[in-house]
Each structure stands twice: as C-alpha cells, then as structure tokens.
Amino acid sequence: MLLTINLSRIIMLNQLIKVSLLISFCGFMTACAGNKMKEIPLVKQVDLPKFMGDWYVIAVIPTAIETQSYNAIEHYELNLGGTIATTFTFNKGAFDGPLKTYQPTGFVRPESGNALWGMQFIWPIKAEYRIAYLDVQYQRTIIARNARDYVWIMARTPQISDENYLEMTSFVKNLGYDMTKLRKVPQDWSKKTSINDKPVN
C-alpha cells in the first residue's frame, strides 16, 4: 500500500515538473520573440479578498494535466503573508473518474494591481498568471498568458449563459489565441448536494 502511494506521488511530481518546465519554456520563447506578440493587458485592479473562493473552469486551452478534466474547480485562499493558497481539483476522464488535486502557490507581483501572479507548482518555477478579464461583480474571469499557450475561462457558477460564454470566448479570440484549441470543460453537479461536495483529496 505504501509503495503504491509513493509511486503515485512520484508520477504526480513528474507530471508537475514536465508541466512547469513546458510553461517556463513557452514563456521564454515568448520573451525571445520580442515585439512579435503584444503583452496581454491586465485588469486595472483586483480586490484580492473578493477574488478568493471557488471558480468553476468553464473552458480552457489546457495544460497537459487537465486535458481530460471534468468538474474542474480552482479555489483560492489568501495567506497571511500575501501569497495565494491554490487548490485545483477535477475528475479525470469522466464525472466519476479519479479525483485529481494540485496545490500550487500564487505569488502576487508588486505594482500589478494584484492582477499579475506567479503560480508555483514546484520550486523555483513561477508560471505567468494574468488576470485579463474580471467583471464588476467578480462572477466571471479570464486568466491568460503572454505566450497564448494556455487560457482559463472561469465563473462562480458551473454554467454561464450563452451570451456570457460568447462574450468571453470572443474576448479570448481578440487576445490572439488559437480558438481551435479551446475545450469546454464538462460541469455537472446534479448529483452533488452542495458546493461542499466538490472533489477534495
């Protein structure tokens, strides 16, 4: 049993290392491209306490670990030191698939209006995390990257209206993303009694 647990941890660590290195490489290549790709604008100011809590992933251009995600949720909690304790959970492959949990730490970049974070899965790599869109009510957000490699469309509810979805996907398209890579994340909480039933490892 202990051997099985250790093997699972090793496999997960290897996945995180691969994803972190890939994200860093994409960021490096973007920097080398100079002015070929414009910097994605940040929202002017983010009220961090108001931004904390659960965000359902509505659609994504995914990293390697989330290509088969179902019921994906990103949860943020503000630490006393100002970092962001992040818990990303989803079922892999199906609504009843194995639960996956990742717990990176967000580091808010100074003088960014709290809209630019470095998301650290493994030390010392911090992946770029840009809050490019946030509605006034803090109900919908878009997390983007200058490399245009990954993007996350998220909301406080598992589903959003067709009108809001079209608005947000159009926003992503206008940022310069390849929309053929966008995956709508299946969300079905009909068998859950409350948000507290979200997957937790």
Language-model regions: role of each:
Residues L7-S20:
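Bacterial N-terminal signal peptides that target proteins for export
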Residues L21-C26:
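Hydrophobic helical h-region of N-terminal Sec-dependent signal peptides
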Residues C32-N201:
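A beta-rich soluble binding module of mature secreted/lumenal proteins
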